């Protein structure tokens, strides 16, 4: 465990939550966005935003999106990743059955949310903001405390956009720790 790295990940998580809320409030919609936490040449932690991939709307676009993110991971070498989007989801507890033949956007039990999903070397976090659309055309966001979770065991996380860093955790984490330890000595 490294306190400097853990603090950087906590800041990254807060920055992405704040960005998502501000962006949605100002624009009324949220495209698919990905941000990475990595180190720059000076060994400072920085956030690198992936190019906006908002044009990817369809079910068929998802594999292309994931492939692009995985390619970016190889270049950026992040220790944390944020996936932010506006989405239709079906809220459920882990042990509840869900009909995977029905897309969330077509389910009668769907919820419209802004989702901020954070993945790091040691755990995942999920923050959901219910989108409330008023008859005036205005929107408001309400944080969903029941389904949001700051620290989720990565083995409990599933979904199309989950565990994208999985193949690189140990390698990138070890590189970052070595770099931090060299700078502290």
What are the language-model segments listed below?
Residues 1-64:
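N-terminal domain-onset segments
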């Amino acid at each position: 465990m490294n306190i400097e790295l853990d603090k950087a990940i906590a800041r990254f998580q807060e920055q992405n939550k704040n960005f998502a809320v501000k962006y949605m409030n100002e624009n009324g919609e949220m495209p698919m966005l990905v941000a990475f936490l990595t180190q720059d040449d000076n060994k400072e932690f920085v956030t690198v935003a992936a190019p906006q991939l908002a044009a990817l709307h369809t079910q068929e676009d998802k594999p292309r999106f994931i492939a692009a993110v995985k390619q970016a991971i190889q270049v950026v070498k992040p220790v944390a990743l944020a996936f932010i989007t506006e989405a239709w989801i079906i809220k459920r507890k882990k042990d509840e059955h869900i009909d995977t033949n029905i897309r969330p956007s077509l389910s009668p039990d769907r919820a419209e949310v802004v989702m901020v999903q954070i993945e790091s070397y040691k755990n995942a976090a999920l923050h959901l903001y219910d989108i409330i659309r008023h008859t005036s055309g205005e929107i408001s966001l309400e944080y969903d405390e029941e389904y949001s979770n700051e620290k989720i065991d990565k083995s409990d996380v599933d979904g199309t956009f989950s565990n994208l860093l999985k193949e690189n955790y140990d390698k990138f984490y070890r590189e970052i720790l070595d770099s931090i330890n060299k700078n502290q000595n």
